[in-house]
Curated annotation (Swiss-Prot):
GO cellular component terms listed in the entry, alphabetical order: cytoplasm
Transmembrane spans: none
Protein name per the record: 14-3-3-like protein E
Species for this entry: Nicotiana tabacum
Region (Disordered): 249-272
């Protein structure tokens, strides 16, 4: 693909984002990603890819949670006819979720991870790999759920090994990984202790080096720290867990930034 075509696809992806046509945004960024056999995506390109998939998957995840909640209510009322219809509809949403996850996971494995050359890009893509296996684990059952959870754990651990060795504790990608990894422990593995320990360690390590934060990443990093703190507050009533912040740290709105997704526990998807 010629460079001009790559630039054109990036432009069209931005246009699709503005129009909130995220399926098309995914298509444009997939074309870009498939050109990176030698030269990897720029930071802007990988963030566009992340935003595109985040919005496409996010809509289905929200639909699945709503339908699952309705299904539980109808089951408790004994409305078997309704339950049968809901299960069929939920299956349709799950098929869409599987297709989306398979699409980005294949792209990561075949194009993006193999050519990642910096610690930052390696952690970014491995975290992304873990995220989309985690989304599969949210609705899969039995052996498929176990496999998705194992794949999530492997991807997050691989990313963590690199992040701890090569990225600063305040780096937004390292913090975003810690946030999502802790959500995985809490929501998928039902391990609140490991979730809290991981989140608190990441938070404390970042607080200790907050003075070293540059202006460029200050907003992203402090926002993710806020999300870590919010989750710790949600997950534990242990008063020995210190959640105090230094005076320099100004909490920001915990709503999702451009590349963030928030649910019961808050996780981070994008440029971090």
């Amino acid at each position: 693909m010629a460079e001009s075509t790559r630039e054109e696809n990036v432009y069209m992806a931005k246009l699709a984002e503005q129009a909130e046509r995220y399926e098309e945004m995914v298509e444009f960024m997939e074309k870009v990603a498939k050109t990176v056999d030698v030269e990897e995506l720029t930071v802007e390109e990988r963030n566009l890819l992340s935003v595109a998939y985040k919005n496409v998957i996010g809509a289905r995840r929200a639909s699945w949670r709503i339908i699952s909640s309705i299904e539980q209510k109808e089951e408790s009322r004994g409305n078997e006819d309704h339950v049968s219809s809901i299960k069929e509809y939920r299956g349709k949403i799950e098929a869409e979720l599987s297709k989306i996850c398979d699409g980005i996971l294949n792209l990561l494995e075949s194009h993006l991870i193999p050519v990642a050359s910096t610690a930052e890009s390696k952690v970014f893509y491995l975290k992304m790999k873990g995220d989309y296996h985690r989304y599969l684990a949210e609705f899969k059952t039995g052996a498929e759920r176990k496999e998705a959870a194992e794949n999530t754990l492997l991807a997050y651990k691989s990313a963590q090994d690199i992040a701890l060795a090569e990225l600063a504790p305040t780096h937004p990608i390292r913090l975003g990984l810690a946030l999502n990894f802790s959500v995985f422990y809490y929501e998928i593995l039902n391990s609140s202790d490991r979730a809290c320990n991981l989140a608190k360690q990441a938070f404390d390590d970042a607080i200790a080096e907050l003075d070293t934060l540059g202006e460029e990443s200050y907003k992203d990093s402090t926002l993710i720290m806020q999300l870590l703190r919010d989750n710790l507050t949600l997950w534990t009533s242990d008063t020995t867990v210190s959640l105090s912040l230094s005076q320099k740290y100004t909490p920001t709105n915990a709503d999702a930034p451009t590349n963030n997704t928030v649910h019961t526990s808050k996780s981070f998807l994008g440029s971090a």
